[in-house]
Amino acid sequence: MSPKTETKASVGFKAGVKEYKLTYYTPEYETKDTDILAAFRVTPQPGVPPEEAGAAVAAESSTGTWTTVWTDGLTSLDRYKGRCYHIEPVPGEESQFIAYVAYPLDLFEEGSVTNMFTSIVGNVFGFKALRALRLEDLRIPTAYVKTFQGPPHGIQVERDKLNKYGRPLLGCTIKPKLGLSAKNYGRAVYECLRGGLDFTKDDENVNSQPFMRWRDRFLFCAEAIYKAQAETGEIKGHYLNATAGTCEEMMKRAIFARELGVPIVMHDYLTGGFTANTTLAHYCRDNGLLLHIHRAMHAVIDRQKNHGIHFRVLAKALRMSGGDHIHAGTVVGKLEGERDITLGFVDLLRDDFIEKDRSRGIYFTQDWVSLPGVLPVASGGIHVWHMPALTEIFGDDSVLQFGGGTLGHPWGNAPGAVANRVALEACVQARNEGRDLASQGNEIIREASKWSPELAAACEVWKEIKFEFKAVDTL
């Protein structure tokens, strides 16, 4: 073919590089109910206009590339491209902007969190025109939500399975997290459950190591569960971590847990991956297992305020992928969490409909159209003196998880569990009687400790423990 011959596909095609904003910045665009909406915190490189930066994000996370290509003429860019439809400055921050981007629903595979994230955040975060980029929030349209199964069971079904109502659930992470033999590990589980806890937990990095292979751990923990249930008359559980190096091995562990008749298994959803997590969630629903989710590795992604992905987005993704519990910070313990922001994504986990509320970091109204809710788990450096605040902040639909705050009791694991259960029951009773947990919390705990020697001992041990550090994300 002669170099001068013009094909139909090349009509109107002009090679070269053009500004993203000419195609992808569309402030006149009216968003559709079926669009996935994203709010990005954008920090452009010096000299890059915010409109160009926002348009670049929209382009590189949808149909764009660095140059004009002739195959653009073979499809409808207007139908498939992402659009930066609004930009606003971030108050109090120099050269930072919130760029709002709308994505057509046809860009995403149904029921795949993996594909959604691959498109929206898979490539654009290394873009040279940006100094930093953070995904602050997503609006998932109802049409897309309905393609997901979501949590295996949800909050109400879990309460019915456990026959426990009107209070937060109590848990404990077995410590030391690594090094115990399976038999000693099972003994610690039994003591905690016998003392009054609802759940005990594998730590996130307990998988199948030389000192404790997974099958041995599962067997001894199942024995502990059944023994504690027989003695207390309550349904008990232990989060058996099924996370493994392959999906096949993960499923083998989940199947063995089901055969043992235990109520719940666990997965590290970020290190394990969304595809593995969704696979496990589907199995758990089909086989009556609850699924506890640990967020190991989240701070690598969400801790910095100007780069990464906010945890509220990871929480939404988990609700879509599937999990009945997820760790959500404490506000009061050793791990970071601002109260209003934390409660914002806690509501996104539990509630069916959440209104836009920028004061709590919620950029979009979200309708989950009856997708089951997820119980937030508060854990990390908490003890009995935190119980009133935790009960007030998280409410009944939560799991309060005390690791060192149970196993660090001077009299042992079972008395540590007793102390936590007594403290919780005292706080719930006081709240139900109309007392203010925020102002009277310490008094409520002291009153309960007068008739519970286990609680009195715990109060004495942890009376001066505080975690007061400056947040590193101010750097």
UniProtKB/Swiss-Prot annotation:
On modification after translation, the UniProt record reads: The disulfide bond which can form in the large chain dimeric partners within the hexadecamer appears to be associated with oxidative stress and protein turnover.
Q: Which SUPFAM superfamilies match?
A: RuBisCo, C-terminal domain, RuBisCO, large subunit, small (N-terminal) domain
- The residues that hold Mg(2+) are K201, D203, E204
Q: Which residues bind substrate?
A: N123, T173, K177, R295, H327, S379
Task: Tell me which residues bear N-acetylproline.
Answer: P3
Record note on cofactor = Binds 1 Mg(2+) ion per subunit.
List every position bearing N6-carboxylysine.
K201
Listed GO cellular component terms? Answer: chloroplast
Per the record, residues carrying N6,N6,N6-trimethyllysine are K14
The UniProt entry lists the main location of this chain as: plastid
User: Which superkingdom?
Assistant: Eukaryota
- Has the keyword Chloroplast been applied to this entry? yes
* Catalytic reactions of this protein: 2 (2R)-3-phosphoglycerate + 2 H(+) = D-ribulose 1,5-bisphosphate + CO2 + H2O; D-ribulose 1,5-bisphosphate + O2 = 2-phosphoglycolate + (2R)-3-phosphoglycerate + 2 H(+)
- Transferase listed as a keyword: no
Q: What else is known?
A: The basic functional RuBisCO is composed of a large chain homodimer in a 'head-to-tail' conformation. In form I RuBisCO this homodimer is arranged in a barrel-like tetramer with the small subunits forming a tetrameric 'cap' on each end of the 'barrel'.
The annotated subunit structure for this chain is: Heterohexadecamer of 8 large chains and 8 small chains; disulfide-linked. The disulfide link is formed within the large subunit homodimers.
What protein does this entry describe? Answer: Ribulose bisphosphate carboxylase large chain
Organism (species): Magnolia acuminata
Per UniProt, what is the name of the gene that codes for the protein in this document? rbcL
